[in-house]
Amino acid sequence: MSTAQSPIQTDVQHVPAKTTKSIKLVDEAQAKTNLLGMTQAQLADYFKSIGEKPFRSTQVIKWIYQQGVTDFEQMTNLSKSLRDKLSANACVIPPKVIHRQYSDDGTRKWVFEVTGGSLVETVLIPADDSKLNGRKTLCVSSQVGCALDCSFCSTGKQGFERDLTAAEILGQLWVANASYMTDENDSLENVDHSLWENNVTNVVMMGMGEPLLNYRPVVSSMELMLSDHAYGLSKRRVTLSTSGVVPKMYELAQELDVALAISLHAPNDELRNELVPINKKYPLEQLMAAARNYVFDVNPRHKKHVTIEYVMLDGVNDSNEHAEQLVALLGNLPSKINLIPFNPFPHANYDKSSNNRIHAFSNILSEAGFVCTIRQTRGDDIDAACGQLVGQVADRTRRSAAWQQSIKDRENS
């Protein structure tokens, strides 16, 4: 696993001049460096750049992520002079929550306004099975919109605007944990940090956007999710889902050992070209080779599997023949297959497969020796179910031609 660190990419914030109980805000005209989302190595470099000892990075990271503290004045094991210096030059500011909804089934959704006024969403899904010991899974967004244009996904219909910064990605997790320290309608500024507890147990990079097309900020965020000084999640509890950006799959395999999920949705190239257009660039043979490399070649003694995500579309990809093709495609790849009932959205050209059809499809996979689950739809009453993360924004079907043309350069950078 590579330990190379990227240069510091500071997230400069302009925030209003008022100070609150737990989140210190600064003058609009004064740009400050947001420390949220910096890895320990990046933060150590930042401290060296301001003439401080790099070990301070560990102290500050623990305050931010283990105690939820964003006001430097409350970081009591830092010297007064350092606290003053940080207050003058830095900040810890998660993205602004402009809307939140709590579903009847316990699902929570937040709409964030990020720099520039764009909106993104994140969803927290609590397990409803007592055997799962209170598991709470956060579905995190990595981009504003998505450029991949999967034909069955409502999120893609708003087009792509920009990548999220590491602060905007990791801030989603910070806010989700903070929500358990406040009442439903209370401000995050009223968090009692003495009661802080990191309630989120699992993170899936499955929200808005393709994570591997925003590679460095996503990897930096996941490093902090795994760090014992920050959130301390185990590798099997952090999952990155990709539609198949093959070069970045190889890069990730060398750098960060997290769980991998593949948004497959079709067992042959002809159908996947229609449903998941990136398949035209990286067809199934290349995708499966990258998946096998991730499981077998990097650390063959470490038992891993790939999660295969497969949305069930009535009369499109749900026949017995499709199931048999999927069995042949996966072969000996250690896989857990997650069948996802389609969640309809306005002007969708697809329907949900019947329950009988989904179960028949599942039975073929199970009989072939694969672990196969059928995802329970959660949060659909607040438009938080899979494929519904479209945000409360205008439909942006006219995608950025410049972005589309730059994908190749970004993948190979």
From Swiss-Prot:
Catalytic activity: adenosine(2503) in 23S rRNA + 2 reduced [2Fe-2S]-[ferredoxin] + 2 S-adenosyl-L-methionine = 2-methyladenosine(2503) in 23S rRNA + 5'-deoxyadenosine + L-methionine + 2 oxidized [2Fe-2S]-[ferredoxin] + S-adenosyl-L-homocysteine; adenosine(37) in tRNA + 2 reduced [2Fe-2S]-[ferredoxin] + 2 S-adenosyl-L-methionine = 2-methyladenosine(37) in tRNA + 5'-deoxyadenosine + L-methionine + 2 oxidized [2Fe-2S]-[ferredoxin] + S-adenosyl-L-homocysteine
Keyword Methyltransferase assigned: yes
Annotated binding of [4Fe-4S] cluster, by residue: C146, C150, C153
GO biological process, one term: tRNA methylation
Assigned keywords, A-Z: 4Fe-4S, Cytoplasm, Disulfide bond, Iron, Iron-sulfur, Metal-binding, Methyltransferase, rRNA processing, S-adenosyl-L-methionine, Transferase, tRNA processing
Function description: Specifically methylates position 2 of adenine 2503 in 23S rRNA and position 2 of adenine 37 in tRNAs. m2A2503 modification seems to play a crucial role in the proofreading step occurring at the peptidyl transferase center and thus would serve to optimize ribosomal fidelity.
Similarity-based family: Belongs to the radical SAM superfamily. RlmN family.
Protein name: Dual-specificity RNA methyltransferase RlmN
Organism of derivation: Psychrobacter cryohalolentis (strain ATCC BAA-1226 / DSM 17306 / VKM B-2378 / K5)
Gene name of the record: rlmN
